[in-house]
Amino acid sequence: MSQAGEKSRVPAENGLVSPGRVFQFQCLMSTAKAFLPEDFLLSTEWARTLYFEHAAKQPIFDYHCHLPPDQIANNRQFENLFQVWLAGDHYKWRAMRTNGVPEDLVTGKNTSDYDKFFAWAKTVPYTLRNPLYHWSHLELRRYFGICEIINEQTAPKIWEIANAKLRTPELSVHGILTKNRVNVICTTDDPVDDLAHHIAIKKTKLETRVYPTFRPDKALWVNNPAGFNAWIDQLTARSNIDVRDLNSFLSALKNRHDFFHSLGARVSDHGLENIPDVECTESEAKTIFDAARAGTAATPEQVNKFTWFMMLFFGRIDADAGWTKQLHLGAIRNNNTRLLKRVGADVGVDSIGDFPQARGLTRYLDRLDSESKLPKTVIYNLNPADNYVFATAIGNVQDGTIPGKIQFGSGWWFLDQKEGMEWQINALSQLGLLSRFVGMLTDSRSFVSYVRHEYFRRLLCSMIGKDVENGLIPADRALVGGMIENICYKNAQNYFGLETGKL
């Protein structure tokens, strides 16, 4: 139903419309803004100026995402709206399940794409005040020119219009990246990946620069010998190093790190519950490694020790190579055994953990710093209770070599929404230097998620604009506008040291 149709509904009493209530309702509607107006989130003149004259003009530097490299290499032309919008989007899947949608209409293999899309369209009206409501409508507008409110009634028309536009070159993968002026993408890649798709991307005419990111989470799986050993077999084959002991294991990982570097990678990433507050000698690490290779699962204490040992190793090789390390800390993953067995991992059944973060993280950063082996590092918390912990941790080990060497990352995952981003921006502002912040990333598997950069930029300009209007920040366009441009793009461009496209 269109917005006009929604406005025509008038409250009734006993089945009859009260004239007084008609007048009252019409007055109420006349004072309401249109949904998603041009100045969405921009409530002051300064906010509008900062956004339209500074933020919106910046290209995108997407330094962390989960976009599939094969689809970039092949310049995929999506078959329909479900494929580009819903396939793989666990944010939407989670909302659909909460809305009572059966799993067959969420991830079912024997259900048509249209039926799953229609189930999502029926869910959208129930996502009011969830960021999915804003993101979904922004995506429809920015990519397809569809201003309709999506619901059960408008779904067929939206499906038809979107699918027609998806057949055009402008909405191929390369077209989408060009339209959004995405200058850099850093994907998320396993060390055993052959990176063939990244090699293929370099041979295309795509202006966006696409780099792999080294994500060695499986190197810590000593509590899962079957998975650990299967992965080491792949590591052995890919590195041509026979992994028989801890030393050869580290050599094989360094070999893959070097290979990633040769293809332009300058960023690593780790997803952990926390950095353990333990110590581990090389002898202890060897014992734990050998036991896992022999099929004996490590105890929780041993997992913590091995994690500490390996994370120091990864930090040192990142520092030696001039890379940036990312630490995503605090998730409890795959919390639904039923869906894990049926659908697999990473399907929208993860949540925020309450793990101790402060001591292990600060000791880790300090240890590497004391060895002169601390790389540039971006830390992300998932539990908002840790905002001030992380915002203060970054200040302990700044060494004066580059601005903002240790970064408090943008609101991650469940915090990637209006309130969560405001919390992160405010914590960083109060306890660090917001002006040196490297800004937003999509962290997404969807090519139409670049509206999240728009969302972040509008929110940032809203917050800073209000401060200017209230006399908390000087009304200096060069000073404030420059800060906005830096946060939205230029800081990341300078920080990560990657060659960028020129979109």
List where the protein language model places each region.
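Short, positively charged and aromatic/hydrophobic N-terminal segments
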Residues: E13, S18-F25
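Short, low-complexity, intrinsically disordered N-terminal modules
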Residues: M1-S2, S8-R9, P19-R21
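Hard-cation-handling environments
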Residues: A331, N336
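Polybasic, lysine-rich low-complexity intrinsically disordered segments
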Residues: K7-S8, N14
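Metal-cofactor-binding active-site regions of metalloenzymes
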Residues: L28-A321, K373-P375, I379-A391, G395-L503
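Active-site loop ensemble at the mouth of alpha/beta enzyme cores that anchors a bound cofactor
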Residues: L340-I352
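Divalent-cation-assisted or electrostatically stabilized phosphate/pyrophosphate-binding catalytic cores
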Residues: D354-L361
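C-terminal amphipathic alpha-helical interaction region
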Residues: K325-L327
